[in-house]
A protein has these predicted regions:
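Short, contiguous pre-domain boundary segments
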Residues: 3-17, 175
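Short, solvent-exposed beta-strand edge segments and adjacent coil->beta transition regions
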Residues: 12, 38, 180-182
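Non-catalytic accessory segments flanking enzyme active sites
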Residues: 19-59
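Generic structural signal for secondary-structure transition and capping sites
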Residues: 34-38, 84, 203
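Short Pro/Gly-enriched beta-strand edge/turn motifs at strand-loop
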Residues: 36-41, 120-123, 269-274
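Short linear motifs in intrinsically disordered
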Residues: 41-47, 129-130, 265-269, 303
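Rieske [2Fe-2S] iron-sulfur-binding domain
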Residues: 46-153, 161-164
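C-terminal catalytic domain of Rieske-type non-heme iron oxygenases
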Residues: 66, 76-77, 139-141, 146-378
Length: 378
């Protein structure tokens, strides 16, 4: 088979340009891929101690993780009386109210600190009869501390089974880590475009001066499974030369913390389809998830975790790493916006084009397209 025919064969799994703008297809994606897929809600480190709560920013704070005596639970954060939001952000339930959930508007009180079902209405001032309106409680499943909502209809993914064969699970261990920050990043392009950029290393050298001098794709290793892929890349030049001032600061902080010794990898990037990404960097773990808002708007939520001692004592390390991460994120935005702008231009003139995959640097993108076509039956 000639190189040209191989390229043409490879390109057959690419998606048509209309797939990034079509409202009907987008609605079907939400139902088929997201509603019945791995429904990530947050990490248990957001509520490490009993009495902690964390409202979900990706859901306009409409639900909350609460650490009760029964464990970490997910409840509605909307009062059953006048539908007001109850809890705000991250914090601790007020011990003055017995550690229960209390709406500040009219003092409706819901159980969260005793054997009664969490979210059960236990107080409604000035009502002669109990309204019997409880907060909804949503069952959870857990993998490596990542919390996923169980699908009430009995469908959806078995996360533990999907990720059972994951090679670098030990590197993605959150033991001894703490959540430092949650970043919400709005992307003006299709969610699939985000995943495509994430799953190809072809652009790292040309488009990421900072990241491209921090990691090297010369020793890129892929791990593929039915519902996930993993990229592992090495350290560039023993971190001897930074490609941007922001990465210079990050590399200096990293080498200072490590007494000048380079790490074993540059990065590990896990993608659990369709939208969960767990990332390893030296002394850093992140969970990045996509929450589609429309065919051309996507919310990216990034949670930054570090060893507890770094969170407590190494603020310069934390700030330098997050600045480097966000520099790369902004560069990825430009790539994705250019791609979708080109697709829109092709669609406007009634044309459809796609190019070949570069192997091995775009193998992940090809697997994602094949996974998408199978799941969506297209």
């Amino acid at each position: 088979m000639s190189d040209l025919s191989l390229q043409l064969q490879q390109a057959s799994s690419q998606l048509p340009v209309s797939a990034y703008f079509d409202e009907a297809l987008y609605a079907r994606e939400l139902q088929t891929l997201f509603a019945e897929g791995p429904r990530y809600v947050g990490h248990r480190l957001a509520v490490p101690e009993a009495g902690n709560f964390h409202t979900l920013p990706q859901e306009q704070h409409g639900r909350a993780l609460v650490h009760t005596p029964k464990g970490v639970e997910l409840i509605s954060n909307v009062c059953r009386h006048r539908q007001a939001l109850i809890l705000q952000g991250r914090g601790e339930l007020d011990t003055g109210t017995g550690g229960n959930v209390v709406c500040p508007l009219h003092r409706w009180t819901y159980a969260a600190a005793d054997p009664r079902p969490t979210g059960m209405l236990i107080g409604a001032p000035h009502f002669e009869q109990d309204p019997c309106l409880n907060l909804h409680n949503y069952p959870l499943t857990e993998w490596n501390g990542l919390l996923f909502e169980k699908n009430a209809a009995g469908r959806g993914r078995d996360v533990a089974a999907d990720l059972a064969s994951l090679g670098p699970r030990a590197d993605l261990d959150f033991s001894g880590y703490a959540l430092d920050r949650v970043e919400l990043h709005e992307c003006n392009y299709n969610w699939k475009t985000f995943i495509e950029v994430y799953l190809e290393d072809y652009h790292v050298g040309p488009f990421h001066p900072g990241l491209g001098s921090f990691v090297t794709c010369d020793d890129l290793r892929w791990e593929f499974n039915r519902h996930f892929s993993v990229q592992t890349v090495g350290v560039a030049n023993r971190l001897g030369r930074a490609g941007s001032p922001v990465y210079q600061r990050w590399q200096e902080q990293l080498l200072k913390y490590r007494d000048g010794k380079p790490p074993k990898y540059g990065a590990i990037w896990l993608t659990y389809y369709p939208h969960v990404m767990v990332e390893w960097y030296p002394h850093v773990l992140t969970v990045s998830t996509l929450h589609p808002i429309g065919p051309q708007k996507t919310l990216n939520m990034v949670e930054f975790f570090y060893p507890e001692e770094i969170v407590a004592f190494e603020r310069e390390f934390v700030e330098a790493q997050q600045a480097a991460y966000m520099e790369t994120c902004v560069e990825d935005d430009e790539i994705a916006e250019r791609m979708d702008a080109g697709r829109r231009a092709l669609m406007a003139r009634g044309e459809d084009e796609s190019g070949p995959y570069q192997s091995p640097m775009e193998d992940g993108m090809q697997q994602f397209h094949e996974w998408y076509r199978k799941e969506m039956s297209v």
